[in-house]
Amino acid sequence: MAMNTETLSLIKQSIKTIPNYPKEGILFRDVTSLLENAVAYKATIDLLVEQYRNKGFTKIVGTEARGFLFGAPLALELGIGFVPVRKPGKLPRATISQSYELEYGHDSLEIHTDAITANDKVLVVDDLLATGGTIEATVKLIRQLGGEVQDAAFVISLPDLGGEARLTALGLELVKLCEFEGE
């Protein structure tokens, strides 16, 4: 589905770039500036609703923490459930865990064991796609619980970091509202 270029431009322009954060040589794409702009934030959610309405999804899974900011309102608008994937020890019921590689080590994510069933068709939502490690771990969690996941949506993609190729290799169809070059 083609997206309105004027709206996409508004969204992209609302994302501030912070040079040398969190370290020298990095251009940090600050999605919180988009959240501060009510018109751009609503336009973001509206575009995602337009993209995914009537596609048969039963759940949206958002990754900690900024995935919650886009996934939860999208789920509400689509009239489906929202499932948070969190860092270890943050969810109160029984969970399963999936580790993933970081630049300097490992981390892991958890999901409630009863949050996804074999009857669920799941859309994964996050603010930013960089290397794809957190979303790959999230997809593995969903599939381990029997859920069907073939789609992921991002506000920002940094294609130079390899995440798009990593996730398409998992069989995911990706929607990215904005792309930025570099790191």
From Swiss-Prot:
Catalytic activity of the protein: AMP + diphosphate = 5-phospho-alpha-D-ribose 1-diphosphate + adenine
Domain of life: Bacteria
SUPFAM superfamilies, per the entry: PRTase-like (SSF53271)
EC number(s) per entry: 2.4.2.7
Cellular compartment(s): Cytoplasm
Keyword Acyltransferase annotated: no
One CC-aspect GO term: cytoplasm
EC class name: transferase
GO MF term list: adenine binding; adenine phosphoribosyltransferase activity; AMP binding
Keywords assigned: Cytoplasm, Glycosyltransferase, Purine salvage, Transferase
InterPro entries found in the cross-reference section: Ade_phspho_trans, PRibTrfase_dom, PRTase-like, UPRTase/APRTase
Pathway stated in the Swiss-Prot or TrEMBL entry: Purine metabolism; AMP biosynthesis via salvage pathway; AMP from adenine: step 1/1
The UniProt record lists the keyword Transferase: yes
GO biological process: adenine salvage; AMP salvage; purine ribonucleoside salvage
Oligomeric and partner information: Homodimer.
Family in the record: Belongs to the purine/pyrimidine phosphoribosyltransferase family.
Function: Catalyzes a salvage reaction resulting in the formation of AMP, that is energically less costly than de novo synthesis.
Protein name as annotated: Adenine phosphoribosyltransferase
Source species of the chain: Shewanella sp. (strain MR-7)
